[in-house]
A protein has these predicted regions:
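HTH-adjacent hinge/linker in prokaryotic transcriptional regulators
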Residues: 3-9, 17, 23-24, 31-38, ...
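CheY-like receiver
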Residues: 28, 125-128, 173
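Glycine-rich phosphate/diphosphate-binding loops that line cofactor/substrate pockets in enzymes
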Residues: 120-132
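Glycine-rich phosphate-binding loops that contact phosphosugars or nucleotide phosphates
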Residues: 130-250, 256-263
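A short, charged, Gly/Pro-tolerant segment at domain boundaries
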Residues: 262-283
Length: 283
């Protein structure tokens, strides 16, 4: 489709061609434009009281390949049109104001996650991790880097925490898991093909699944034994933003603290041994 056509102009052009249920989607987008750009297809369908297939057909009716492309177009229209966020910094902003703006983004991301993170889910996740033979910390793309960071933090307490480099190695590892193993998978969307392939394989092997995601109604969440929600919102135009990454690491730190405090004696011994081991690396 043409990239020069504004989403709202396109919607106006195709409005008469939409079905009754398609118009329900259009009406929701018009009245909740800013919120809608953050919703998964499942969440939007629920808000509109229609099936996910209806939302997908709506996207195709407007000329988009799928939901993700439509959501990006909506976000672009929100950013450049009358619905622009007045709190975004302008080109002439001072460096001091940018520092303040960035600080606000980080605080908002962490506070949003704190408010939406279930303490009960954290405890369930830690119970699974503590009882596991191996815990595989996995993700795709930037989320894999976060999984590596979380794995590294836990490695000072136990050698049962593992990572696997790419989607091929992850599915290989998943195929050899058993009921005593746990997967901690990080996926903001909870809806990537590689993630679903890995989780299906791990599930078939009997492994337990902990998913750290923003979307509790995502396909990945439906497969998980425990869902840890990252409450920070991310625009499709700002995918991979650092405040979102920090919010994910915040959840990782909460897991670590709970894990440590549930067995303080072992924690103290492990930290003493690992601290002594790495001391020789210092100059």
């Amino acid at each position: 489709m043409s990239t020069t056509t504004n989403f709202w102009e396109l919607l106006q052009q195709r409005l008469d061609e939409l079905t009754k249920s398609g118009r329900a989607v259009a009406d929701y987008l018009v009245h909740h434009a800013d919120e809608a750009q953050y919703l998964s297809i499942s969440s939007l369908a629920r808000e509109c009281k229609v099936a996910e297939a209806t939302v997908f057909r709506f996207c195709r009716a407007l000329g988009f390949e799928g939901y993700h492309e439509m959501r990006i177009s909506l976000a672009q229209a929100n950013a450049t049109g009358a619905l622009v966020n007045q709190h975004e910094p302008e080109p002439g902003a001072t460096t001091a104001s940018l520092c303040e703006h960035a600080s606000g983004l980080f605080l908002t991301a962490i506070n949003g996650t704190q408010n939406s993170l279930s303490p009960e889910a954290v405890e369930q996740a830690v119970d699974l991790m503590r009882a596991a033979r191996q815990v595989f910390c996995l993700g795709q793309g930037g989320s894999m880097l976060l999984a590596n960071d979380i794995c590294a933090r836990f490695s000072s307490l136990s050698n049962k925490f593992r990572t696997a480099g790419d989607s091929h190695l992850q599915i290989l590892a998943a195929s050899l898991m058993g009921p005593e193993d746990v997967v901690l998978f990080i996926s903001y969307s909870g809806a990537t093909r590689d993630m679903l392939e890995t989780l299906r394989t791990a599930k078939a092997s009997g492994a337990k699944i902990i998913l750290l995601t923003h979307y509790e109604d995502s396909p990945g969440a439906a497969m998980a034994d425990v869902v840890l929600r990252c409450g920070a919102q991310e625009s499709p135009l700002d995918s991979g933003s650092i405040p979102i990454k920090v919010a994910v690491l915040y959840v990782g730190e909460v897991l670590l603290l709970r894990y440590m405090l549930d067995d303080p004696e072992h924690t103290s011994e492990a930290q003493d041994r690992t601290s002594e081991a790495v001391a020789i690396k210092l100059i």
